[in-house]
Amino acid sequence: HRADLIALLAEGAQDAGVDLRLGQEVTQITREGAAFNLHLADGSTLCPDFVIGADGVRSVLRPALNGAEQGFFTGQVAWRATVPNPGQGAEARVWMGAGRHMVTYPLREGKLLNIVAVQERRAWAKEGWSHPDDPANLRAAFADFTGLARGALKAVDSVHLWGLFRHEVAPVWAKDRAALLGDAAHPTLPFLAQGANLALEDAWVLAHCLRTMEPSDAFRAYAQIRRPRAAKVIAAANGNAWKFHLRNPLMQSLAHTALRFGNAIAPQKILGQFDWVYDHDVTAS
């Protein structure tokens, strides 16, 4: 569960002596020579020696390094919800339909089921994960899904909706005394489930560089190491989107038959096309 991961990271940071200040919002970043000053919503200003912006797709630091950038709406929206596991077991599953697909996978030792449901539509939706929606809208969009999928959707009593936007990988990840990390540097669509993983890889490489170099040199080395892989993964995720939403009945039948046949005789070959993503060991590179 993402909340469990965040709690572990927070605990590790505190054990390492990090001073965590919760409930703070950086509203603006200004430069003073090579330094960056952080202006907070409460009116105070922080003047740190160095800044690492791991502040997500709405990063305040990214435009300070790169200028303003607007993502574009892909014509797809996603719902996310968590429900008690209705009996799916420990498997991750994907259900596909015309212009839609739904992914479910277990959390917390199989007690919970995470649901991510994606639909193609023209109606625009805001970017971000915190926009509540009526569960009835989710169920209506996937009304013809059956079996375990329908059971999971029936159990949803709270759901969030967000628009899927495509962003360019930031041209500049590091400058002077500042660096970007995670979605702040490279927002990704969810079609390879690599957003959080890329951020963790970033963090490991940046920490390794900081252990062996001066911060400004470490920032530059980190960006040089990480940018090519992040760009490659994001391009693969972008290219994976259409495969879930085939509308032509013939193409859909052929593709799904090929998947079933391939999975029956050589499951590892199908999965192997993304070995370079999932088998990557950032600690060894």
Protein language model regions, located:
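Conserved FAD/dinucleotide-binding core of flavoprotein oxidoreductases
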Residues: 1-6, 10, 15-16, 42-44, ...
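Short, cationic motifs built from Arg/Lys/His that form the positively charged side of catalytic pockets
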Residues: 2, 60-63, 182, 226-230, ...
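Short, flexible helix/strand-to-coil boundary loops that buttress conserved ligand/catalytic motifs
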Residues: 33, 65, 153, 192, ...
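Conserved catalytic motifs of the protein kinase core domain
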Residues: 47, 112, 176-177
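Alpha-helical membrane-targeting segments
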Residues: 232-235, 239-277, 285
